[in-house]
Amino acid sequence: MQYSDYPQMALGHQRYIDYAVRHAHKVAIIDTDFITTQAFCIQYEGKAHPFLDSMIKEYPFDVTILLKNNTKWVDDGLRSLGSKKQRQQFQQLLKKLLDKYKVPYIEIESPSYLDRYNQVKSVVEKVLNDEELEGLQHTKRTLTNEK
């Protein structure tokens, strides 16, 4: 993959996001957002992509659930972030980008898959019931054109 491939990947994500939102019943769960794609771009290409920046601003998410990188690494052949140090650095990059774009997020820190499932389920139930989310790192965001 090359730097020039990231916009095409983002456009593919955009189509899936649009479809999911159109067919969702109140909640659409998106596995990979544009911030994650931007983080991989920075990690692998050494710089952010302006197209991804515009997609992050154009597609604000109500809340992001950030899972801490503290489970066993599974090498899927697509990513090369297997060391503990690399995973921690990538987690910090994700948080930095979430903060930069003022994306509301909740970080789930448990390494237990069952605990993660139950915590995510609780977040989704609160969203469905219009309840306040505890532990939200940002409130709703308002982006202005940054120059």
Model-identified regions with their sequence ranges:
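Catalytic phosphate/metal-binding cores of nucleic-acid and nucleotide-processing enzymes, i.e., regions
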Residues: 1-4, 25-27, 129, 135-143
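Short, amphipathic alpha-helical "lid/cap" segments that border enzyme active or binding sites
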Residues: 10, 117-121
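Hydrophobic helix-cap positions at the C-terminus of alpha-helices
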Residues: 16-20, 97, 127
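C-terminal alpha-helix
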Residues: 122-130
